[in-house]
A protein has these predicted regions:
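Active-site-adjacent loop/helix micro-motif of nuclease/hydrolase catalytic cores
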Residues: 118, 126-128, 148, 163-170
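Inter-lobe coupling linker of SF2 helicases/translocases
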Residues: 1-90, 186, 201-205
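A conserved SF2-helicase RecA2
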Residues: 163-219
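Conserved helicase ATPase core of P-loop NTP-dependent helicases/translocases
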Residues: 93-95, 103-106, 110-144
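A short beta-strand element within the Helicase C-terminal
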Residues: 148-161, 184-188
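Phosphate- and divalent-cation-binding pockets in alpha/beta enzyme and binding domains
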Residues: 41, 101-105, 167, 198
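Short, well-ordered beta-strand core segments
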Residues: 137, 155-157, 175
Length: 219
């Protein structure tokens, strides 16, 4: 009776030999070309893009803008994301950091006529993700990387990377969890010769990428 009652609240009971049998994980690193804007800013610490002036007058602001120049200001990465989303009609989760990245990813999904769900600091709406097999779920790390069961999908694309190891590791577990019966696929969009390569290396070591590491790097 207790099990029946718990089932009504969403509990799942499994045989003992099923509990630890998680599916295989396959990781794919997609290297995208860097831009002349990134190289100029890295050298001069100053650049104007459209009407936005980026000034890296401290190590923290330089690190921030190098991250943004690797993602939201890199049209090569945008094109790579579009290609990936075009290649599947399955549910896909896209992790990102900044609001401008969200706007760019939304625009791509709209052009591809993909239904969207979002989890971020402003909104949490999983309706399309639950109901549409081809939905793209846009997840901001702080809001979506921990605690959620998103195993309706088995595919995650990393448009940009977090700095915190815990967010990175937990984000992968949103699909790789008990009850998932499909192989889990992860795609990392990494800009060549950029800060992203350093961040990815540190995250894979289960360490946070800090301002101190940035200052000690050759970037």
């Amino acid at each position: 009776r207790l099990k029946d009652k718990l089932r009504t609240h969403g509990a799942i009971f499994m045989k003992s030999d099923e509990v630890f049998q998680l599916p295989k994980q396959i990781e794919n690193i997609i290297k995208v070309d860097n831009t002349k804007e990134y190289k100029k800013f890295n050298k001069d610490r100053l650049i104007k893009i459209d009407d936005t002036e980026l000034v890296g007058d401290t190590s923290l602001t330089k690190m921030l803008y190098l991250r943004q120049l690797s993602s939201q200001y890199n049209s090569n990465k945008t094109a790579a994301l579009k290609d990936l989303l075009e290649s599947t009609n399955d549910r896909v989760i896209v992790f990102y950091n900044f609001d401008k990245e969200l706007e760019i990813i939304q625009e791509i999904c709209n052009k591809l006529e993909k239904p969207i769900s979002m989890i971020n600091g402003h909104e949490k709406n999983l309706k399309n993700f639950t109901e549409c097999n081809d939905c793209v779920l846009l997840g901001q790390y702080q809001a979506a990387a921990m605690g959620l069961n998103l195993q309706l999908s088995n595919k995650i694309i990393y448009f940009s990377l977090p700095l915190q190891s815990e967010l990175f590791m937990q984000s992968k577990k949103r699909i790789h969890r008990i009850g998932q019966d499909k192989t889990c696929f992860y795609w990392y969009l990494i800009t060549k010769n950029s800060i992203e390569e350093q961040i990815f290396k540190i995250l894979k070591q289960r360490r946070d990428y800090t301002n101190k590491l940035f200052e000690e790097s050759d970037i």
